[in-house]
Design a protein with these regions (language model features):
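Ser/Thr-rich, low-complexity intrinsically disordered terminal regions
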Residues: 1-117
């Protein structure tokens, strides 16, 4: 469970194989699959809104790209009145990276099939 003042948040970085363009497309697909409305900032990062759920307020989700295939995801509670997030920010990040792994694995499998045929 994250605690933060004024806003609780959770972030994590993971490294993936693929070009910058491929990873950008994978992240876009992951956000769309999750149903999180997003906008692209400066052509190199995403900012999404995680829908409100039971016992959960609005969360802002950001994705940034770094050299070497590193993707950083951050989920942050949008209201300063919320001091504890009950693990929601970490679950948002985990859910996002699970989709990224699924999509990137599928893309890698499809690429290897097209090369062998």
């Amino acid at each position: 469970m994250a605690f933060g003042f004024p806003y609780p948040k959770y972030s994590q970085r993971r490294t993936f194989n693929g070009s910058a363009d491929e990873l950008f497309a994978v992240v876009r697909s992951a956000l769309e699959d999750l149903g999180w409305r997003y906008k692209v900032l400066w052509g190199k990062e995403f900012e999404a809104e995680v829908p409100t759920a039971h016992w959960s307020w609005h969360h802002v989700f950001k994705v940034r790209f770094f050299a070497g295939g590193v993707i950083e995801a951050e989920s942050k509670s949008a209201y300063s009145e919320i001091l504890f997030d009950l693990g929601r920010n970490r679950r948002n990040v985990d859910k996002f990276f699970a989709r990224v792994v699924d999509i990137s694995t599928t893309h890698a499998r499809d690429r290897s099939r097209s090369v062998t045929h």
